[in-house]
Curated annotation (Swiss-Prot):
EC number(s) from the headed UniProt entry: 3.6.4.12
Biological processes per GO annotation: DNA replication; DNA replication initiation; DNA strand elongation involved in DNA replication; double-strand break repair via break-induced replication; pollen development; regulation of DNA-templated DNA replication
InterPro entries tied to this protein: MCM, MCM7, MCM_CS, MCM_dom, MCM_lid, MCM_N, MCM_OB, NA-bd_OB-fold
Keywords: ATP-binding, Cell cycle, DNA replication, DNA-binding, Helicase, Hydrolase, Nucleotide-binding, Nucleus
Molecular-function GO term, any one: ATP hydrolysis activity
Subcellular location(s) per record: Nucleus
Subunit text: Component of the minichromosome maintenance (MCM) complex, a heterotetramer composed of MCM2, MCM3, MCM4, MCM5, MCM6 and MCM7.
Protein name: DNA replication licensing factor MCM7
Family, similarity comment: Belongs to the MCM family.
Record function comment: Probable component of the MCM2-7 complex (MCM complex) that may function as a DNA helicase and which is essential to undergo a single round of replication initiation and elongation per cell cycle in eukaryotic cells.
Swiss-Prot/TrEMBL catalytic activity: ATP + H2O = ADP + phosphate + H(+)
């Protein structure tokens, strides 16, 4: 037993096994996988050689013990694989850009080594293999292993290859990290090499070569920075995901070191899965005196996998492309996509359509003089408690590739924009992005928006229109990108909407902020026998079966939604000239209606016109169309009208108008406005849809007033002709 426990490992045999694996492992098509990678390295096409444990597992000559040793002593085996690659490295077969300085230095070193200089018997003068290498070796963990949370990584994992999931909260700048320090002696002229394996090292000052010792000369060493080897280095903070934090606990974070080709792969706000070596890091300086035997820990990253890719990075697989092509041919795709959002939440079809358009967005516009017009949609859901506002927010954050969820009461102005902190690596002041900066090119969901302090809420004004965060703190004056779509949820001023008060009193948000929202959706909880009964049945079904009732089609899964939206976002539709007058007329009519109203329901500004354009373009994107159609504009106007439907329906009840009478008034006013006795059916349907009425109500109105000889209906087209009485 004791002999087995103290079994020594023959690292020469391990190197031979690693070399055999690299030389003989075949890919899925029978090609030499790693030899092809080494050829690309020799041709200077790539620098990183990633060895996958999945390949080692399937290799016939590698046993379980070898796999276990690689997993438990990964740092040592990276060196073993690097030595094996040195022996297998082929000659270059293609011309590549030459680094003249590096090649001249290496040629000179080889010549000096042949003369007994750099490769002499003195170990400090022996050229380390690291300085010759122009590649980096990474070992990737098993793909099917469930990632650990930061809380689950224990002291027993020290030195092992682990896989951890989390969200990136901070990234340092990329700095050069010395890997091999090269010195030149003033007396003997020899090059002295010093390998650096830690973050700090003690430079050499006195030449230790044999020649200086024989001559009894204390040669002074000069550090040659140009001849030394540096590696890109970046420090990242990885924090536990919200769902992994036990109730009442603070999220834990872990320092991650990225080197070489892994730098600049992540940004704050990314949800990632990292595999790497869990290592201790002893304190140094005065902190070491206080810490004693205690050491800090960090993860030396070996591979990075993004949980949700950005839309522009999304690459469709073969089956996904076919599925999207089938969906695009579906005439009812707009409704199906919308109903696939949070299917367990009853109703809110139009709200879900608006949230779908928020995910799609419109392209950003940049004018010739540099002025930018945002393309992201901003939506505010305001309504009574218990109408599933927060659940909708959380579902959208789950579907979006990049999203940050926060609450108004728990967010400060600094927490939303940016804070100035001291970088522990360089002791410099650095900016740490807040929620809006973390959600750059994504969605920032702010719950309890009405409960934010006014001073904190003003920080959002610039983000919502200019899409930047301007900072002037601690000597740092800069502007950060915050190209985010804001999705806010708020309650009315008195908890519930009070119909006795004006909309402005109930909404209780400043006009400067309201005008920045493309859609302010009022969701009021009104008693209705049929609706309440359907909702109760739906909730009971979800509670018992843990899934939504049948929708008549299979709801699309979030990955499919992301794939469809990513394809739609690549389309850049334009507004044709023939629609310009139509949109302008629609906007002016909204302004006229608001001017006539005693208690206006919204603040209509020129931003409203831009909102109509953005929503129309988003609808065209969903159809993969290069041009905006009139139906897109009509749907955009309908959504804007339906967002206040609860208020309009109440106004109609107070004024004593039923749906039939109101539809007749709308059609009569349209005929008077156009000075025509005829109204086309399609145009009439668009008009009443904007006011929140259905096609069934329009047909009922047409039949009733046709029987009264007010108008005549065409038997085939249903066009309306007023009878001149």
């Amino acid at each position: 037993m004791a002999a087995t426990a103290t079994k020594t490992i023959d690292f020469a045999a391990e190197r031979a096994l690693a070399k055999d694996f690299l030389a003989n492992f075949a890919g899925p098509r029978g090609e030499p996988k790693y030899l092809n990678i080494l050829q690309d390295v020799a041709n200077r096409k790539i620098r990183a050689v990633q060895i996958e444990l999945d390949d080692l597992f399937h290799y016939k000559d590698a046993d379980d013990e070898f796999l276990q040793r690689v997993t438990e002593n990964t740092k040592r085996y990276i060196g073993i694989f690097a030595d094996a690659i040195d022996e297998l490295m082929p000659e270059s077969t293609e011309a590549y850009a030459v680094d003249e300085d590096r090649d001249i230095l290496m040629t000179q070193r080889v010549d000096e080594g042949a003369d007994g200089g750099a490769d002499g018997t003195d170990p400090l003068q022996r050229m380390p293999p690291e300085i010759r290498r122009f590649f980096e070796v990474y070992i990737k963990a098993f793909s099917k292993v469930t990632p650990l949370t930061i809380r689950q990584v224990k002291a027993s994992n020290i030195g092992q290859l682990v896989k951890i999931s989390g969200i990136v909260t901070r990234c340092s700048d990329v700095k050069p990290l010395m890997q091999v320090a090269v010195y030149t002696c003033e007396e003997c002229g020899f090059e002295i090499y010093q390998e650096v394996t830690a973050r700090v090292f003690m430079p050499l000052f006195e030449c230790p070569s044999q020649r200086c010792k024989l001559n009894k000369a204390k040669g002074n060493l000069i550090l040659q920075l140009r001849a030394s080897k540096f590696l890109k280095f970046q420090e990242v903070k990885l924090q536990e995901l919200a769902e992994h934090v036990p109730k009442g606990h603070i999220p834990r974070s872990l320092t991650v070191h990225l080197r070489g080709e892994l730098t600049r792969k992540v940004a704050p706000g990314d949800v990632v899965e990292m595999s790497g070596i869990f290592l201790p890091m002893p304190y140094y300086g005065f902190r070491a005196m206080r810490a004693g035997l205690v050491a800090d820990t960090y993860l030396e990253s070996m591979s990075i996998t993004h949980f949700k890719k950005k839309y522009e990075e999304y690459e469709l697989k073969g089956d996904e492309q076919e599925q999207i092509d089938r969906l695009a041919e579906d005439g009812d795709i707009y409704n199906k996509l919308a109903r696939s959002l949070a299917p367990e939440i009853f109703g809110h079809e139009d709200v879900k359509k608006a949230l779908l358009l928020l995910l799609v967005g419109a392209p950003h516009r940049k004018l010739t003089d540099g002025m930018k017009i945002r393309g992201d949609l901003h939506i505010c859901l305001m309504g009574d408690p218990g109408v599933a506002k927060s659940q909708l927010l959380k579902h959208i954050i789950n579907v979006a590739p990049r999203g940050v969820y926060t609450t108004g009461r728990g967010s400060s102005g600094v927490g939303l924009t940016a804070a100035v902190q001291k970088d522990p690596v360089t002791n410099e002041f650095v900016l740490e992005g807040g929620a809006l900066v973390l959600a750059d090119m994504g969605i920032c969901a702010i719950d309890e928006f009405d409960k934010m302090e006014e001073s904190d809420r003003t920080a959002i004004h610039e983000v919502m229109e200019q899409q930047t965060v301007s900072i002037a703190k601690a000597g740092i004056t800069t502007s950060l990108n915050a190209r985010t779509a804001v999705l806010a949820a708020a309650n009315p001023a008195w908890g519930r909407y009070d119909m006795r008060r004006t909309p402005a009193e109930n909404i209780n948000l400043p006009p400067a902020l309201l005008s920045r929202f493309d859609l302010l959706w009022l969701i009021l909880d009104r008693a209705d026998m049929e609706t309440d009964l359907e909702m109760a049945r739906h909730v009971v079904h979800v509670h018992q079966n843990l899934e939504s009732p049948a929708l008549g089609f299979t709801p699309l899964e979030p990955p499919v939604l992301r794939a469809y939206i990513s394809t739609a976002r690549r389309v850049v539709p334009s507004v044709p000239r023939e629609l310009e007058e139509y949109i302008a007329t629609a906007y002016s009519s909204i302004r006229q209606e608001e001017a006539k109203s005693n208690a206006p329901h919204s603040y209509t500004t020129i931003r409203t016109l831009l909102s109509i354009l953005r929503i129309s373009i988003a609808l065209a994107r969903l159809r993969f169309s290069e041009t905006v159609a009139q139906s897109d504009v009509d749907e955009a106007l309908r959504l804007m009208q339906m967002s206040k439907y609860s208020l309009y329906s109440d106004d109609r009840q107070r004024s004593g108008l039923d749906a039939i009478s109101d539809i007749y008034s709308i059609l009569r006013d349209e005929a008077a406005r156009t000075n025509s006795m005829d109204v086309r059916y399609a145009h009439a349907l668009n008009l009443i849809s904007r006011k929140g009425y259905s096609e069934a109500q329009l047909k009922e109105c047409l039949e009733e007033y046709a029987s009264l000889n007010v108008w005549q209906i065409h038997p085939n087209t249903f066009d309306i002709h007023f009878i001149d009485a």
